[in-house]
UniProtKB/Swiss-Prot annotation:
UniProt subunit comment: Part of the 30S ribosomal subunit. Contacts protein S5. The interaction surface between S4 and S5 is involved in control of translational fidelity.
GO CC aspect terms: small ribosomal subunit
Protein name: Small ribosomal subunit protein uS4
MF GO annotations: rRNA binding; structural constituent of ribosome
S4 RNA-binding domain location: 100-160
NCBIfam families: PRK05327.1 (NF003717), rpsD_bact (TIGR01017)
Encoding gene, per UniProt annotation: rpsD
Upper lineage: Bacteria, Pseudomonadati, Pseudomonadota, Gammaproteobacteria, Oceanospirillales
Function text: One of the primary rRNA binding proteins, it binds directly to 16S rRNA where it nucleates assembly of the body of the 30S subunit. With S5 and S12 plays an important role in translational accuracy.
SUPFAM superfamilies (alphabetical): Alpha-L RNA-binding motif
InterPro entries with a match to the protein in the record: Ribosomal_uS4, Ribosomal_uS4_bac-type, Ribosomal_uS4_CS, Ribosomal_uS4_N, S4_RNA-bd, S4_RNA-bd_sf
Length: 210
């Protein structure tokens, strides 16, 4: 499947928020240098940014969420259709589907420092689900599933570094992690109150409902 392989900082700055595409717990400003011409201060042109239309705001929110989870447009729309056909609030179900992706769960458990790195671990068969090798990043993890790093991959430096970052960042309440054994349990689907507050999923619902 095609993936964006360009500058990650560029995407975060375009969306005006840290999409956590680069590892580390530092703020975006210290992870990425400002995109500006040499010797030119940001905003030196004196131009006021154009005001986005309602559609523009909705589109930006969709792009922000899609890029955060590393999902291409076709698959993102598929997630929305599935959420819309499910019981419950469409926006919340959409976020639960995104959070339930195996690559995202691997990231949340601290086995990968970014979702992109977690996706690589999955594709390289370094991750087991209930003792079975799964190499599909979009695999939907179910409550009660056991996720762990394959034994021969536990000594990888990137896995150790990722866990150190996760310990500083903290773990989400819907997962349980044994940071010594590098294994965890997906206890339940996340509640909306536990999901990122900076995401406004209602804007995405409005966009696709047109």
């Amino acid at each position: 499947m095609a993936r964006y392989i360009g500058p990650k900082c560029k995407l975060s700055r375009r969306e005006g928020t840290d999409l956590f595409l680069k590892s580390g717990i530092r703020p975006l400003e210290s992870k990425c240098k400002a995109d500006q011409a040499p010797g030119q201060a940001a905003g030196a042109s004196g131009r006021r940014p154009a005001r986005l239309s309602d559609y523009g705001v909705q589109l930006r929110e969709k792009q922000k969420v899609r890029r955060t989870y590393g999902v291409l447009e076709k698959q993102f729309r598929s997630y929305y259709k599935k959420a819309a056909a499910s019981k419950g609030a469409t926006g919340e179900v959409l976020l639960q589907l995104l959070e339930g992706r195996l690559d995202n769960v691997v990231y949340r458990m601290g086995f990968g420092s970014t979702r992109s790195e977690a996706r690589q671990l999955v594709s390289h068969r370094a991750i087991l689900v209930n003792g079975q090798s799964v190499n599909v990043a979009s695999y939907q993890v179910k409550p009660g599933d056991q996720i762990n790093v394959r034994e021969k991959s536990k000594n990888q430096l990137r896995v150790k570094n990722a866990m150190e970052l996760a310990q500083q960042r903290g773990f989400m309440p819907w997962i349980e992690v044994d940071d010594k054994k590098l294994e965890g349990t997906y206890k339940a689907k996340p509640e909306r109150i536990d999901l990122p507050a900076e995401i406004n999923e209602n804007l995405i619902v409005e966009l696709y409902s047109k």
